[in-house]
Amino acid sequence: MTIMRKTHPLFKIINHSFIDLPTPSNISSWWNFGSLLGMCLVIQILTGLFLAMHYTSDTATAFSSVAHICRDVNYGWLIRYLHANGASMFFICLFIHVGRGIYYGSYVLTETWNIGIVLFLTTMATAFVGYVLPWGQMSFWGATVITNLLSAIPYIGTTLVXWIWGGFSVDKATLTRFFAFHFILPFIIAAFVLVHLLFLHETGSNNPSGLNSNSDKIPFHPYYTIKDFLGVLLLLMVLMILALFFPDVLGDPDNYTPANPLNTPAHIKPEWYFLFAYAILRSIPNKLGGVLALILSILILAAFPLLNSSKQHGMTYRPITQILYWIFVANLLILTWIGXQPVEYPFTAIGQISSILYFTIIVILMPIASMIENXILKLH
């Protein structure tokens, strides 16, 4: 008798995706972050669902409803902090996942890579609208500043901003629609994740050597299910330590002050995972230029498959590109640090240099390094 998981229409899909999937035998722990992102998404949807049961999306009661969740709802404080810190874990995994893709040349799988960029942008949008919901000072002013950037779009900008706000300022209409967006977007993300996996399983996974691994594949279960489970345990441990011991370490103290349109915080800044893009935005004096740089800072990822001219797959055997890669990572950390600093010398200057370097490494230096490495290969 044939095994049910191989014949049943529904189980067959699960079987081909998570059980009998042929997987390269040498993929390292850097390949764990895809499953960890799936885990993060599940945690966020579940905790978010329970928070939505008690939250009210009205300017008069939003802030106090979050306080009510923390004080009066059974384990509400835990659900709230798991959700807030779960977002941080989500973005840590996301950055590592994208960084792995760049390092090992996974961007040659263009469909998977491009849907990944769409996922990244959708996740950023979800996190942004979610940050507005507690209706604290930083929620309100963050929403005001970031949505206002759309006014830089020529001709239709001002109308567009007023249309997104649902009025002439960030108010009740804005909060209500942001809650609606924040509720629906994770399910859209989940749908995109399935498309992401569909495209990935068309070609199979990449591997650290950058060589074709068709001659050496092993089943996903039990080898990688157990490996992913270890990753999940470690992720949950870090998340629990964050949520239970340091719940506010990644948050902003200003968000414990209810939103007040008449009082601007000293330093308006987004959550830590947006700081690199915020630093790039601020480093350009022109408003429209800043907005374009902000958008390009993410969309530049789509250039990787186009700019790739290397004869080798991934950076494993490419020392020059490796050096550039780690400079790029360090530069990204510098941008993250600058994003949280006040707009004054020397921070502005450092931010401008880092922003230029961010784009230069990807668009100019890495392709040049590839050409040099190709030339070196020909010598031997």
UniProtKB/Swiss-Prot annotation:
Q: Kindly give the membrane topology term recorded for this protein.
A: Multi-pass membrane protein
Q: Which residues cross the membrane?
A: 33-53, 77-98, 113-133, 178-198, 226-246, 288-308, 320-340, 347-367
* Cofactors named for this entry: heme b
- UniProt-listed GO biological process terms: mitochondrial electron transport, ubiquinol to cytochrome c
Q: Which residues bind heme b b566?
A: 97, 196
Instruction: Spell out the Pfam families in the cross-references.
Output: Cytochrom_B_C (PF00032), Cytochrome_B (PF00033)
Q: Where in the cell is it found?
A: Mitochondrion inner membrane
What is the UniProt remark on how the cofactor binds and its stoichiometry?
A: Binds 2 heme b groups non-covalently.
Could you tell me the keywords of this UniProt record? Electron transport, Heme, Iron, Membrane, Metal-binding, Mitochondrion, Mitochondrion inner membrane, Respiratory chain, Transmembrane, Transmembrane helix, Transport, Ubiquinone
SUPFAM superfamilies the UniProt entry points to: a domain/subunit of cytochrome bc1 complex (Ubiquinol-cytochrome c reductase) (SSF81648), Transmembrane di-heme cytochromes (SSF81342)
Q: Name one GO cellular component term.
A: mitochondrial inner membrane
Q: Which Gene Ontology molecular function entries are recorded, alphabetically? A: metal ion binding; ubiquinol-cytochrome-c reductase activity
Annotated a ubiquinone binding lies at 201
Annotated family: Belongs to the cytochrome b family.
Q: What is this protein called?
A: Cytochrome b
